[in-house]
């Protein structure tokens, strides 16, 4: 079969399945592809290939499918550790998630942990699929499980009362055994995902931001900073701010070039050189950003959700304690920071995921959901995400 051209005629949304081990995440993923995509069997999805994100190896399965309204890229992870790593590194960014919970078991430890992770890494919306309803004969019991899931979501600041909960059986859908809880439930689920998970704002519509990778001085022209535009658009003649590491300063972009050609603007995804007025070669450095004035502030202190690599993954061999001082690699540069462990946490072991407070020695242009690597002497020992800014 010839590869069909990817049609960009529908909004694109990234989602994933989360939930406790053996509650049916992979079966549900397979069932969705059966009705909305190119069918992928359970074992095709379960044998997820390994990939690297921020120096960390993660197994993830990617499938795609579409509803009449949208095109979806869907990620499913085989193991619990892969979920933790995936959500923290943002290897597969999620605009929303389908929480799969077995009606027979109700919420379990990883159900709770995945909801907490979703909250910490800023997953905007969750839809619930209550799976294996054919294993529960008692309607009252089913209602209790639903109530329990709603309360759990609310306890992590998701709108538990309003979240759509669809009851069904992924297995019934795969085996065509009971249309009502099988195919009908899967179609109802995707209708809920279409309606409830918001379409993400495209990077190009967001305020301009470009991490600075390099600085050059061109005689007779001035200083050029290069990098890949992360979001938004920058037009020649526009005022921008240089943020991070040093006090924030303003400048004007007097030229944009790409592949040695002069352009009138650069936009999200472009690798550009921006000529900046009145900035000396040593007045700007790698690790700062160019951005729309006032859109991003520099910060030193933040709460982070982090995953610490195991020894086998090439990480530390020993635990660390409060006042641990590694480097935090933000966008294009390393900054030393001091880690404070939460009350009651004595130490952090390799393989743990943990919420910590970090204070950097210099401020970095920072906002919630910004990802970073934790490094020691250039070696990655962990990954993290800014959960909230302290100051």
Swiss-Prot record:
Q: Which InterPro entries match?
A: EF-Tu_GTP-bd, EF-Tu_GTPase, EFTu-like_2, EFTU_2, G_TR_CS, P-loop_NTPase, Small_GTP-bd, T_Tr_GTP-bd_dom
E.C. number: 3.6.5.3
Q: Where is this region: G1?
A: 19-26
Q: Where is this region: G2?
A: 55-59
Q: Where is this region: G3?
A: 76-79
Please tell me where Mg(2+) binds in this chain. Answer: 26
GO MF entries = GTP binding; GTPase activity; guanosine tetraphosphate binding; translation elongation factor activity
> Which CDD domains does this one have?
EF_Tu, EFTU_II, EFTU_III
Its localization reads: Cytoplasm
User: What segment(s) does the record annotate as region G5?
Assistant: 169-171
List the GO terms this entry assigns under cellular component, sorted alphabetically.
Answer: cytosol
Entry function: GTP hydrolase that promotes the GTP-dependent binding of aminoacyl-tRNA to the A-site of ribosomes during protein biosynthesis.
Q: What family does the database annotate?
A: Belongs to the TRAFAC class translation factor GTPase superfamily. Classic translation factor GTPase family. EF-Tu/EF-1A subfamily.
Quaternary structure and partners? Monomer.
Write the protein's name.
Answer: Elongation factor Tu
Source species: Rhizobium radiobacter
